[in-house]
Structures are given as structure tokens and as C-alpha cells.
Regions:
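Register position in tetratricopeptide repeats
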Residues: 36-37, 70-71, 104, 138-142
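Canonical positions in the second alpha-helix
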Residues: 49-50, 83-84, 117-118
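Canonical tetratricopeptide repeat
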Residues: 63, 97, 131-135
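Terminal, low-structured helical/coil segments at or just beyond the last alpha-helical repeat
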Residues: 112-145
């Protein structure tokens, strides 16, 4: 009798774990679909739910940052980008988005540091590097002596 109870308990625990894993995945996938349909409020909610199930889901944070960029909520955008970079410092898209933010702030030293890092990690967005370098030249402090 005890063996049957243990077996049933293991079965229910297994089902619960499988369901939570599937729910996490489905929230992200559904959020991505809504994002591509430009339904940002719905996708934001789904990405936030995905993060509840998996707080280390860097892609949900990245999509949230993009949504906040669209909404012009700079504070939340930067917070989510920083979270992505904390989870994966090699994420080139997050690095690029952070460079854009720092360029707008005219933070020359931070952009220069990010460009060096971006050069090492870029795979897909390497074509954006000349744009950043050109913007960096415009920011470069002038030595007026």
C-alpha cells in the first residue's frame, strides 16, 4: 500500500514539473508571437509570466527591453538590458541596445568600453559596428590646447 502511495506521489510530482516547464515555454513563445504582431501590452504580460516561471530567461528580459524601448520607458528598458547582460554578458543584441542608450546619454567612456566588448562578441550584428564607431567619433572629447 505504501509503495502505491509513493508511486502515485511521484507520478503527480512528475506531471506538475512537466506542466510548469511547458507553461514557461508556452508563455515565452506566445509572447514572441504577440510581439511580432505588435501587440506589446499582451506580449509584455506574457514575458513577465515567463520570467515568473524562469527568472533566468534572458530572452524574456530582452524582449521586455525592446517593448520598453518602443514605449519610451528608458528606465525599465535599461533595467531589463542590464539583467540580460548579467545573465549573459556575451549577448550581442543587449550590448548593442546598451550602446545606443549610452550614446544618447553622450557617455563616451562607457560607449568606448562597450564597443571594445562588442567587437569581441559580434556575430550577427557586426554590420552595426561602423554606425556606432561613427557616432563615437562625433562624441569624442576634443583636446583644446
Amino acid at each position: 500500500m505504501i509503495k502505491i502511495i509513493k508511486l502515485v506521489a511521484v507520478f503527480f510530482i512528475s506531471i506538475t514539473l512537466i506542466n510548469s516547464a511547458l507553461a514557461e515555454s508556452s508563455f515565452f513563445e506566445e509572447g514572441k508571437i504577440k510581439y511580432n504582431e505588435k501587440k506589446y501590452e499582451e506580449s509584455k504580460f506574457l514575458f513577465q509570466r515567463s520570467i515568473i516561471f524562469n527568472p533566468k530567461d534572458q530572452y524574456s528580459y530582452l524582449y521586455l527591453a525592446k517593448i520598453y524601448k518602443f514605449e519610451d520607458n528608458k528606465r525599465e528598458e535599461q533595467k531589463n538590458i542590464n539583467t540580460v547582460l548579467l545573465l549573459d554578458p556575451q549577448n550581442e543584441e543587449a550590448n548593442y541596445l546598451l550602446m545606443e542608450i549610452e550614446l544618447k546619454k553622450s557617455n563616451y567612456s562607457k560607449v568606448k568600453e562597450l564597443v571594445e566588448n562588442f567587437t569581441k562578441i559580434c556575430k550577427k550584428l557586426c554590420d552595426k559596428k561602423p554606425l556606432i564607431l561613427e557616432s563615437l567619433k562625433n562624441l569624442e572629447p576634443k583636446n583644446e590646447s
